[in-house]
Amino acid sequence: MDEMSCGGGGGGARWKRARVAGMGEGKAGGGGGAAFLGLERVGMVVRMLPVPEKVSARARVVRGSLVAHFRGWRVVRETWWWVLLLWILAGSLGSFYLFLFMNAQSLDKRRDSLASMCDERARMLQDQFNVSMNHLQALAILVSTFHHSKTPSAIDQMTFARYAERTAFERPLTSGVAYAVRVTHGEREQFERQQGWAIKKMYSSSNKKQSSPGPGPGDAAVAEIREPAEEYAPVIFAQDAYKHVISFDMLSGNEDRDNILRARKSGKGVLTAPFKLLNNRLGVILTYTVYKYELPAYARPHERIQAAIGYLGGIFDIQALVEKLLKQLASQESIMVNVYDTTNESPISMYGDDTGSGMCHVSVLNFGDPSRKHEMHCRFEKKPPWPWLAITSSFGTLVIALLTGHIFQATVHRIAKVEDDFHKMSELKKRAEDADVAKSQFLATVSHEIRTPMNGVLGMLQMLMDTDLDTTQQDYVRTAQASGKALVSLINEVLDQAKIESGKLELETVPFDLRTVCDDILSLFCGKAQEKGLELAVYVSDQVPQILIGDPGRIRQIITNLVGNSIKFTERGHIYLTVHVVEEVMSCLEVETGIQNTNTLSGYPVANRRCSWESIRLFNRELHSSEKSFAPIASDSISLVISVEDTGVGIPFEAQSRVFTPFMQVGPSIARIHGGTGIGLSISKCLVGLMKGEIGFASKPHVGSTFTFTAVLMRAHCKGNDIKSSEFKGINALVVDHRPVRAKVTKYHLQRLGVKTELTAELNQFISKLNSGSLTAKLVLIDKETWLKESHCTPLLVNKLRNNDKPDSPKLFLLGSSASSPKGGSDTSREHNLNVIMKPLRASMLQVSLRRALGGVDKVHCRNGVVGNSTLGSLLHKKQIIVVDDNIVNLKVAAGALKKYGAEVTCADSGKKAITLLKPPHNFDACFMDIQMPEMDGFEATRRIRVMERDLNERIERGEAPPECASIQRWRTPILAMTADVIQATHEECLKSEMDGYVSKPFEGEQLYSEVARFFQNHDQVE
């Protein structure tokens, strides 16, 4: 690493080591030539090294790379002066080209700026001109309406002049207006008699040249009587400034005559050529034709000529118009503007001086008359500035090129060091990757190996609990069980984190009942919630299908993690789990409501869950866009929104940004007080991502938190096991609870049982219905908090029910929890002899409670309740069961658990032995098969057993079965997979190997009962 330590011309420690080894004679650090000589000799020695015939391929690659490295180094050292010279030359040419390029860009930018300013002025000039044209056209319509369409006319010279003067602000660009009427030769005499004057013709004072608009002050016009003609256009109305043109025939001037003929033929406004106004400024006349009636747009020219009855003219001061425009658009960089009439070959200047040179831009003007052409020419008043940006940039480029050449030599000498560092880093990177793979494999292996004895420990502890223990010993065993389960949970989290980091975490796709999963989670935290006095509840929307397809284990893991955190950080109030579809949540987001955040499950304020739903907007848009692209695939998908709301301590604002960071907690005190590793939320976020969802939260310190995540699952086309029982169909129930959210939860669980439910908020309403005889409910469920709140009504209610001798009198239930049972309230049910249902509510637990109260038989299948030994004993008594596991401890635990329930157990320590024992015919009723065993795993053993059973069934069908199978129609032994990690035994693998289900190790009463009950009640061998 210290190659450059010897200084000089580039000789270094590397070459010094080569010389010491006898591979060079030059002195280290004695100059570039000596170093180069040593380097060349090293290359020669490398080339001359003998290559053994059996040398490894890696050694050949290393030797080849060394030879190539030394050769490339020598070539660079010999040619670097020429390279430097070429570099400087290229830098000089490049800087010159950069100057030309940037200067051209500057000119183009200046040209574009001029074009933009010129076009803007031209556009505004056209717009202002068009506005005045529109007002003139409106004045023409006014004359047609009130002069020609009224008899007698509503307009005279005084009215016209006054109106024109008072509306002059609408025509700021016109200096005057006049109206001439169309008179034929036959109408002339009568017209002159009506007007009181004769029609005159217009001449200019200089050589009788026609001018417009006629004689005026200062032009010495000669007024002569108009000679006879086919038709005339005498002016009858004019603005006061131009009333001297009244009685003059506008057709007597060539320019005006041509204007009028074009105007009435086209039906549009037409312009004259520029001429000098009375104030010696240039202007034009715009002429509009007035018609007898409104003509369609497609009218022909001869139809327009016949319908013409008059002509309205307006004089425009072009110079004033342009000057006003330039004042409005005064910019930082002024420009010179010239306006030309380019109708003829020789353009006529209408505004501006013709002087000026340099860059020029021409914008075409359109004043509405297609027969006349106008242009605006624009130039900058100032000369362009020096292109300092191009000069400095090109000079800077040249300086950079020289500096680059200056450091080129040092760069060449550092190439070797960089290459060495690169090879070392590559080797370290490979080692790090290998270490990461080894770490993941180690975690997976060690975690599994730890879980196996831990399952044995937990199983033995469970068996120890079934022995005769005193209270102290039971407490010790429960503590050991809790510690063991916590350790297994921690191991599972670490394993999940390792799988996530290695990208090997996969999800199952199996049918499951989400409502049952939620009930199981509530059962898991029921004890902790009651110990802390918390209200714990779940609500699943009716829009959520009963059976979904997804990974129930991972969904359970996410919800369990969120609810567990809420239990951990909540000391009062409630924890509320809700499940909706995305469409329901989106409708809530779009409609803002004024509901207070205290209208909650327990009445405590909560964090606004809308904040945690905001990410769902983006999720919903992405979901719909993907559904459009893959409509056939996404037709069965459903997007769920699952929220966990609590009234805990909340998350400090400064810690909210690192909530999902692995191994991060709010502070060190959290780990001391509540424990945990800080990876639960990180794992949950990764699992949500695998489900194509999003996760977010809203939290307010000292108020609470609401965590929300989305998941995309599939709809199941099969029907699930509906929990609704026929014994509750047609039964009505009344729920009395003053908290709407809590009443909604109770109604949800009752409806799952098929009970029609009505809600009321006060006991008085229930008593009123009871007194009036309008009560149809057979079941009345009153929340204990409401019962205590309205305790003044309870004696009356109890007496009323006791004195009611009717057989159909309602059954009264109190919904109680530790949260709603203050001191002294626990004796309420005992005092009044009431039925009590403890919360949190679950459908199965509620089913059992209602059945007992109604006098039904208490069935044993209770998923969330505690399954007694007698229940499993009735199923497993005298059953022949074989347990297959390669681990002796697991065999002992499984055998002990099954023997506890009266089963006769046979153990096998390998898959091959299981195949031998289960070769039909045999006397076993079921088999519990471990899926991870050496030589042959449980899946392969099961497949071979099924092959033997199929062969026997074919022989039975052909009548070739042995005598032992004479009374059996079809042989099939139930086989259940045993695993420490339920996720590994996926539903697809079980189906492929024809297994019938799975149980987790160690055995738990509830799960064991739910599995074996299916086989020993419905899938027994047919004898």
UniProtKB/Swiss-Prot annotation:
Highly expressed in young leaves and at lower levels in roots, mature leaves, stems and spikelets. The chain crosses the membrane at residues 81-101, 388-408. One of its GO terms (biological process) is defense response to bacterium. The keyword Transmembrane applies. Residues 151-352 form the CHASE domain. Its EC number is 2.7.13.3. Activation probably requires a transfer of a phosphate group between a His in the transmitter domain and an Asp of the receiver domain. The keyword Ligase does not apply. It catalyses: ATP + protein L-histidine = ADP + protein N-phospho-L-histidine. Cytokinin receptor related to bacterial two-component regulators. Functions as a histidine kinase and transmits the stress signal to a downstream MAPK cascade. This is Probable histidine kinase 3. The lineage of its organism: Eukaryota, Viridiplantae, Streptophyta, Embryophyta, Tracheophyta.
